[in-house]
C-alpha cells in the first residue's frame, strides 16, 4: 500500500464518457423467454430439406404436412422427442393451438408457425389447463354448467319419445305378423278353391264326353227319391206307435228317432269348413247310392259327420264315379250310344279331350 506524501492530494480523473459512470445493465434479451423446445424442434424438423419425404412445409408455407405418419413416428419422434407415439405428438400440437386444416391428410397450421420466420415461435403460447383458470373464468364455467339443466330436461323428453316410438314399432310389428299369417291362410284357401275348381271342371268335361251319364244321373235321382219316401213313411209309422213307459224310461224307438231327427246339415254353416256346392253334393249322393247296395241299416246307423269326412272329392273319387256309371249303363234299357255334337264342342272348350274309358 502506497503511503501518501504530506501535501499531496489524490486526483481522480472524470469518466471519459457518460456511459462509464452508469450502473451496469444486463445483456439485451437475457431475460427474454424463448420458444418452447417442442416448437423449436418441430420447426427444425420441418425446415430440414432431408426430411421432406416424411414431413415438410405446405404449399403456402403457413402450415406443415406429415406425409408418412408411420415413418415419422418410428424414426423422427424417438430422435427428437424421446417417444414414438404419433397421437401424443398431435395432442401436443393441440395444446399449442395448432389446428388440422385438411381432413384427408395430417396438415397442421398456426399463426406463429411460418416458413422462414423462426422468431415468431415465441408468440405461440401453451394453453393452460382448466385447473389454472382465474376465478372469473371458473365462475363462468359454473354458470354454463347451471345452464345445462335445460338440456337435461330436453334429453329426458327425447328419451321418453324414443320409448314411445319403440313401443309403437313393436305394436306395428305384431300387427304385421298377424297380417302375414292371415294372408298365408287366405292364400291356402284360394289354392284349395282353385284346386277344387279344376277338379270340378275335369269332372264336367269327362261327364260331357260320356252321353249316358245324364241318363244315369236321372235314374239315380229317382232311386234316391224312392228311398227318401220309404224312409219318411217308416219314420211316421214309428211316431204313431208309442208304447207306454214309466217316467224316466226311454224306449229304443225314441233313441233311434232322436238319432234320425237330428240332422247336422242345418248347422253346417257354423263350421269353419266351406259348404259344398250342389254339384259336389250330387256327386257324393251318386257315389253313396252306388255303394248303397250294401247293408242299408249299417249306413243308417253310421254318423253323418264320419261319412262326410271319409268321402273326399279327389280325382280318384271322380274316376270311380264315372267308371261306376259306365258299368251301370249295361243294365239301363233304351240308352243311346251316340255322342251329341254339342258335347264334343263343350269338351273341346274345357280342354279335357281324353275319355275316362281311355284312361
Curated annotation (Swiss-Prot):
Record's keyword annotation contains Cytoplasm: yes
One BP term from GO: cellular response to heat
Bias (Polar residues) occurs at: 299-311
Basic and acidic residues compositional bias, start-end: 1-13
Motif, Nuclear export signal: chain positions: 279-286
Which residue stretches belong to region Disordered?
1-30, 290-314
**Which residue numbers does the motif Nuclear localization signal cover?**
233-237
What is the superkingdom listed in this entry's lineage? Eukaryota
The principal location of this protein is cytoplasm
Q: Where is this motif: AHA?
A: 315-324
Q: Which InterPro entries match?
A: HSF_DNA-bd, WH-like_DNA-bd_sf, WH_DNA-bd_sf
- Provide the record's note on post-translational modification: Exhibits temperature-dependent phosphorylation.
- Report the Pfam families cross-referenced here: HSF_DNA-bind
Ranges for region Hydrophobic repeat HR-A/B: 158-208
Q: Which GO terms describe its cellular component?
A: cytoplasm; nucleus
SUPFAM superfamilies, alphabetized: Winged helix' DNA-binding domain (SSF46785)
What is its induction?
By heat stress.
**Coiled-coil regions listed:** 150-202
What is this protein's function? Transcriptional regulator that specifically binds DNA of heat shock promoter elements (HSE).
Oligomeric state and partners?
Homotrimer.
What's the domain remark here? The hydrophobic-rich region (HR-A/B) corresponds to the oligomerization domain. AHA motifs are transcriptional activator elements.
Q: Give the family this protein belongs to, as stated in its UniProt record.
A: Belongs to the HSF family. Class A subfamily.
- This chain belongs to the protein called Heat stress transcription factor A-2d
In its UniProt entry, the species of origin is given as: Oryza sativa subsp. japonica
UniProt lists the gene as HSFA2D
Amino acid at each position: 500500500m502506497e503511503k501518501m506524501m504530506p501535501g499531496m492530494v489524490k486526483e481522480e480523473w472524470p469518466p471519459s464518457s457518460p456511459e462509464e459512470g452508469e450502473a451496469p445493465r444486463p445483456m439485451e434479451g437475457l431475460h427474454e423467454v424463448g420458444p418452447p423446445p417442442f416448437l423449436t424442434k418441430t420447426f427444425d424438423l420441418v425446415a430440414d430439406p432431408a426430411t421432406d419425404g416424411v414431413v415438410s412445409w405446405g404449399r403456402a408455407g403457413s402450415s406443415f404436412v406429415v406425409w408418412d405418419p408411420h415413418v415419422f413416428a418410428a424414426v423422427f419422434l424417438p430422435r427428437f422427442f424421446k417417444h414414438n407415439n404419433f397421437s401424443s405428438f398431435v395432442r401436443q400440437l393441440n395444446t399449442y393451438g395448432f389446428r388440422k386444416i385438411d381432413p384427408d391428410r395430417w396438415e397442421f397450421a398456426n399463426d406463429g408457425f411460418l416458413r422462414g420466420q423462426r422468431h415468431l415461435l415465441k408468440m405461440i403460447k401453451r394453453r393452460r389447463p382448466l385447473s389454472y383458470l382465474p376465478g372469473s373464468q371458473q365462475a363462468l364455467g359454473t354458470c354454463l354448467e347451471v345452464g345445462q339443466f335445460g338440456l337435461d330436461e330436453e334429453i329426458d323428453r327425447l328419451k321418453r319419445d324414443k320409448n314411445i316410438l319403440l313401443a309403437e314399432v313393436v305394436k306395428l310389428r305384431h300387427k304385421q305378423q298377424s297380417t302375414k299369417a292371415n294372408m298365408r291362410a287366405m292364400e291356402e284357401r284360394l289354392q284349395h278353391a282353385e284346386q277344387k275348381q279344376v277338379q270340378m271342371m275335369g269332372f264336367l268335361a269327362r261327364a260331357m264326353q260320356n252321353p249316358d251319364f245324364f241318363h244315369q244321373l236321372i235314374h239315380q235321382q229317382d232311386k234316391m227319391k224312392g228311398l227318401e219316401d220309404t224312409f219318411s213313411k217308416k219314420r211316421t209309422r214309428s211316431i204313431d206307435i208309442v208304447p207306454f213307459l214309466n217316467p224316466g224310461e226311454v224306449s229304443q224307438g225314441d233313441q233311434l228317432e232322436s238319432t234320425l231327427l237330428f240332422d247336422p246339415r242345418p248347422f253346417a254353416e257354423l263350421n269353419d269348413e266351406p259348404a259344398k256346392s250342389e254339384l259336389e253334393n250330387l256327386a257324393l249322393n251318386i257315389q253313396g247310392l252306388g255303394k248303397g247296395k250294401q247293408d242299408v241299416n249299417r249306413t243308417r246307423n253310421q254318423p253323418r259327420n264320419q261319412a262326410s269326412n271319409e268321402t273326399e272329392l279327389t280325382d280318384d273319387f271322380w274316376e270311380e264315379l264315372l267308371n261306376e256309371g259306365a258299368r251301370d249303363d249295361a243294365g239301363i234299357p233304351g240308352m243311346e250310344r251316340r255322342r251329341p255334337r254339342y258335347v264334343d264342342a263343350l269338351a273341346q272348350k274345357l280342354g279335357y279331350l281324353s275319355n275316362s274309358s281311355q284312361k
